[in-house]
Every structure is written in C-alpha cells, then in structure tokens.
C-alpha cells in the first residue's frame, strides 16, 4: 500500500505542479504514445539483451515484492525460533529421531507445524544441511559459521539480481529519453519551413521524450529498485537468524540460550518479546516430555 501511495504522490505533484503553473497536458498526451513506445521499447529490449532468461523471469516475478513488502513477518521469526528449539532439543535427546525429521522435512511433524517455513526451500535446506553436517561430526563452530556465511552471501547475490537489473534500466532511461528527443528534433528540422507556432509544438513534443526518460528513471523504476533492495535485505535477516542459532548450538550452549542468541540478533521490529517466546518454548518442552 505504501508503494502505491508513493506512486500516487509522484504523479500528483509532478503533473499537478505542471498544470498549476499553467502548463497544458494536451501536448504531453499527444506525444506520449510515440515517445513512450520508443523509450519503453528500447528499455525492455536492453533489459532482455542484458539478462538471461531465468534472470529476466526472476526480475519480473520480484516486482510484486515492491507492493507486497517482505515475505517474512514478525510471527515467522517467532515460529522459526520455535522450530529450531524443537529440532535442537530433540537432537540432544535423541539424535536418531532428529535425523528422521531433517532427512524428510516434508513429512516431519515438527516442520509441519510451521507451514510457511516448510514451504521455503532455502530455509529448510539450510537448517537440514547444517544439522546433518553436525551429526556427521562436522561441528567446528567457526568452520560451520564460515560455510553458512558464504552460503548466505551466494543467496544474497542471487536475490539481488532483480535489484541490479532494475537499477540498470533506471540508469539507462534518461539516455533513452534523450534518444527519443533527438529523433523528435530531427523530425522538427525536416519541417523547418513551417510557421513558429507549429515548430514550437513539434519541439515541445520532442522534449516530452527527455521528460519521460528522466521521470521514469527517477520517479518510478529507480525507486522500484531501491524498494526491492530493502525488501531483499529485510528477508535476508530471516536466514541470518538461522545461522546464529545453529552456530550457537555448535558451541554447546543450552538450548534456550541458543534460541535467545537468535532472538537478540533479530531486527527490533520483528524480534519476538522474551516473555511470549519463553511461554511458547515452555509449552513445546512440556509437549515433548
């Protein structure tokens, strides 16, 4: 919703200010279809040219995140800590029983209690791979932390592709607007024998291209790229929390301490309160006994 409000403000202030200053929309509306076709068409073509097929599809899919916001909500962080508590607690009591859950998470009763997390491939794989490695005696906390950090960096690099692709388009739009404007000037020069009032309209129409390129770059596409980047970074905190808890587990801290390490490393606006989380953990512990 906030993104839609932002777009509305951009349009109202730009065109409202133009009309309030005495500008007429007629010349813009008349030239818009042709200028927009040239600029948008060239931008789309350059986008397709500079991205592989999967990258282009990934970018188009990610645009909806601009409006939907982060995938992971405060309740998901609470559920993640509860899930990790159950798995770590079970692993310390019965490693064989834990193995059944991490080898087949889709049929696990523990994972099944947290369907939003279970539906996320990256989160489930990160949890299961790390716990599986620990059961195979790859349990040096510093080495595991380094491996997880590299994994998160690779995941972040992939997730940021859409942001970079959109920003590249935004950076190129002003230049494409100039291209459209130059073509308009060339057209105008071929009619140099026309009266000044006609030439004025033709030059004004040509300048619509420059306006449109800059407007789309800094008013629409650029902010889209920035917003998408913030959403990706926000969601990445979810996976970083998994790393913090699982590394704390390898240091052989008490299970509750491992979870508290994760809770305190969660961003403040999504961090579960200590009381609510403690109450949930007590209920889970009682149910397991």
Task: List each language-model region with its residue ranges.
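Large intracellular
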Residues: 19-160, 234-289
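Helix-termination/interfacial motifs at the ends of transmembrane alpha-helices
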Residues: 5-8, 12-27, 147, 151-229
